[in-house]
């Protein structure tokens, strides 16, 4: 979906979280789209992060973890800083062959941020991307208490990689095979189409932002 939570080493949130409706990142979005030759929508986590850098926001130097809502909740329940590949692709572009963040683009971003002298590198502060079926941790005692303060819920329940609503909708409508798709008519209206191959070039109207084992595009 594209949400940005920023935390320091103590696990404290640095600024109020920024949602997919905070369209305040046009400068960063345009700059990163040009740098990567890949459409970076304003709502993506990486656009929010780079806009904070461009704005010279004081907290950026203290970032230890950047998360979406799904990654944040999973972290609180399991202690694991991981994210399903679909939601991870709404943070930063992913490599559909390696099923991980695109390393060449990470290197480009680190080069872009280098003159600012931050102690962190991008990959170090993002949740690890996991695909469906991979182990994503178990419910901890602390997590169980968050869900059920009465103590009846016990820890140890295995957890799957956390995902957002778009991937959930694709599974629910059985739209996961190539050349299939679905239309969401919720908070926003968009089509989610599973493509057969990469697009030949970036299009502002098409976000390549939801990938599990397929390449999907959402038209907003």
List each model region and its residues:
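Glycine-rich phosphate-binding/catalytic subdomain of phosphoryl-transfer
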Residues: 1-217
